[in-house]
Amino acid sequence: MASGKGCFYANFKPDNGNYTKDGNLITSRVGIYSANSNGLYDMAGNVAEWTSTIYTEAGVEAMNDINPTLKYNAAQEDPYRLKRKSVRGGSWKDPESYIRSAWRTAEYQNQPRSYIGFRCVRSLANSTSERAKSTKGKRK
């Protein structure tokens, strides 16, 4: 493009990415940044995260109380479009505007990517509130 501003459809991403602002030239080690106000670490930016939820164009509009996570185990003979999973959040390769948990895209479940990871979680539903409070902000 003669103006030098580029073109949304021809360029890699629509915004500028500042990939080295934090001093890391590659993905960063888990836990090197401070916890957020909920005591959680590394909630956005290093890698986007696989979810167990299938990807549909309708997105969250298709969710309901009966099927809140839109799970579907695609069979070998199913169309390829049914084998997409939702990927949430941005990664090291994305511009700042994508680094939020509400950002959502799709990837085929059999396609590994260097910018997509997963998050190990555990439920505090069966824990006592005191135990949950005592571990807030502490790393194991």
Which residues make up each language-model segment?
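Functional-site microenvironments in short loops/helix caps that host divalent-cation chemistry
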Residues: M1-R100, S129-R139
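A short catalytic or substrate-binding loop motif that flags glycine-/basic-rich loops and adjacent residues
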Residues: D22, P112-S114
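Short beta-strand segments enriched in hydrophobic/aromatic residues
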Residues: T51-I54, T105, L124
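Short, intrinsically disordered/low-complexity patches at protein termini
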Residues: D65-I66, N73, Q111, R122-L124
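Short proline/glycine-enriched turn/loop segments at secondary-structure junctions
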Residues: A74-P79, T105-P112
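Enrichment for repetitive, rod-forming helical segments
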Residues: P95, E107, Q111, N126-S129
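Short, structured beta-strand segments at or near domain termini in extracellular proteins/domains
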Residues: S114-E130
